Amino acid sequence: MKNYVIAIVAISTVFFSSCKASKETKSTANIYDTTWELEYISGPRIAFDGLFPNKKPQLTFDQKETRVYGNNGCNGYSASYTLDGKKLSFGEAGPTTMMFCDGGGEQQFLQQINKITSYTIDKEGKLSLNEGDVPMMRFKKVAK
């Protein structure tokens, strides 16, 4: 009888561990092959549309090159990133086309993205970039 209990506990442990691992892998995979458009940024007391009057920042994660590409609401944006489970950090941004940007959103975007330490994807499929547990930026998937 004791052997049956031990066997059931061992099988249950393996089963639940594998379910958790596959859920995390699927969630990590969701960050790739998608263009993400910013819909919220913390910090400024200016309306979101006022920060980004011409276009919203977008990001695309390249898994093979471990780089993120897109725009910061005005100029191009490109940087390396490090992803380990739910931990996420961005490297120094590469050079961009220097245009004058209305609204001040470009600087806010660059300041916030350098503070990011983790990410989550919620039930609605929205990507939150967090500083600790605090969401600093939220992105929605762009329809292709």
Predicted regions and their residues:
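Bacterial N-terminal signal peptides
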Residues: 7-15
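Lipid interaction determinants
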Residues: 4, 17-144
